[in-house]
Amino acid sequence: MKVLVPATTTNLGAGFDVFGLALDLFNEVEFSFDTKETTIESTGKYASDLKDHNLFFEVFRFFERKTGYRVPPVRIKQTCNIPVSSGLGSSAAVIVAALHIANEGTGRNLSREDLMKLAVELEGHPDNVVPAFTGGLVVCYQNGSHLDFEKFEIDLSLTFFVPNFSMCTNEMRKILPEKVPFEDAVFNIKNSCQFLAKIAAGKIKEALKYVGDRLHQNYRINGNKKMKEFVEAILSKNPEYWFVSGSGPSVCSNINDFEGIPYLKDVLKLRVNNRGMIVSE
C-alpha cells in the first residue's frame, strides 16, 4: 500500500495559524504489515537531511494511547520529496502518513475526521495537517478540542525559495511576543479578511496583494541572522508579494532574479494541490 502526503504552506502572511495550503509536492510512503519488526527506510532528495525516524514511532505510540489499539509491526519505505524543517510541512506529512498507517494496521476503525483531530492534537495547530488531508486552501478554526475548517479549491502557482539552513517550529514560536500592538492586530485582520474575500470572489491572484503581516514574521526573521539576510536579499528584488512559509525558513515570492541571494538551496515552483492525501493499494 502507498500513501502520498502533500507539502503544505501556512499562514500566508496575514492568516497566522488560520490559513493552510496544500501543494503538488508529495512525500511517498509505501508500507506493508508482512513483517515481525517495524523498519523505516528513507530515500529521495531530502532523505539525508533527516536526523532520525522518531516521529513515526512517536505518532504510533500516540495513536495507541488515544485509541487503545496496538499498531502492528510495519515495514515503511519513505521517499522524501519535501524539504525537511523548511516550513513546508515535512513534519505534518509524517504525522498524517503515520496516522493513516496506524489506522490501516488496526482495522480502519477511525474516520478521516477522527484522524484529522488526532493530527491536530499532536501537531498543536491545524493549519499544516488539515490541508494535508483535504487539499486546497483551508481556513482553520481551533478552540480547545473543537476543530472547524472550510476548504477552497483554487488554481494558483507559487514559487518557494528554500535556504540551506533549517528552523525549528517550536523554537520559532518561543520568539513570538505574548502581546502585540493594537494597530498590528488590526493590520492583520484587514489583510486576512481581504485575502479571503478575494479568494471567495475568484480573484485568486489579487488575493496575494493582501499577505502583509505584522504579528509573527518580523519576530522570526529578526531572531535568526541567516534568515534576516535571506529575506532582506529577497526583498531587495522588489517583489510584488512575499511571505514566510510556515515558521520558515522558506519564503514564497514572485521574484525572477535569484542572483545574490545568500544561502539559497532550492527554488520550487509548485501548484496548489486541491486533492490532498492520495491513497493507493
Curated annotation (Swiss-Prot):
Key words, A-Z: Amino-acid biosynthesis, ATP-binding, Cytoplasm, Kinase, Nucleotide-binding, Threonine biosynthesis, Transferase
Q: Which residues bind ATP?
A: 83-93
Q: Which reaction does it catalyse?
A: L-homoserine + ATP = O-phospho-L-homoserine + ADP + H(+)
Residue ranges annotated as transmembrane are: none
* This protein's GO CC annotations: cytoplasm
Q: Recorded GO terms, molecular function?
A: ATP binding; homoserine kinase activity
Query: From which lineage does this chain's organism come?
Result: Bacteria, Thermotogati, Thermotogota, Thermotogae, Thermotogales
What the entry lists under InterPro entries is as follows: GHMP_kinase_C_sf, GHMP_kinase_N_dom, GHMP_knse_ATP-bd_CS, Homoserine_kinase, Ribosomal_Su5_D2-typ_SF, Ribsml_uS5_D2-typ_fold_subgr
In which domain of life is the source organism classified?
A: Bacteria
Its BP terms in the Gene Ontology are: threonine biosynthetic process
Q: Which family does it belong to?
A: Belongs to the GHMP kinase family. Homoserine kinase subfamily.
UniProt feature coiled coil, ranges: none
Q: What is its EC number?
A: 2.7.1.39
Q: Kindly give the PANTHER family that the UniProt entry links to this protein.
A: HOMOSERINE KINASE, HOMOSERINE/4-DIPHOSPHOCYTIDYL-2-C-METHYL-D-ERYTHRITOL KINASE
So what does this one do? Catalyzes the ATP-dependent phosphorylation of L-homoserine to L-homoserine phosphate.
Q: Which Pfam families match?
A: GHMP_kinases_N
Q: What NCBIfam families does its record include?
A: thrB
Q: What is this protein called?
A: Homoserine kinase
| Top EC class, one word | transferase
- Locations listed in the record: Cytoplasm
Describe which pathway this protein belongs to, using the record's wording: Amino-acid biosynthesis; L-threonine biosynthesis; L-threonine from L-aspartate: step 4/5
Native organism:
Thermotoga petrophila (strain ATCC BAA-488 / DSM 13995 / JCM 10881 / RKU-1)
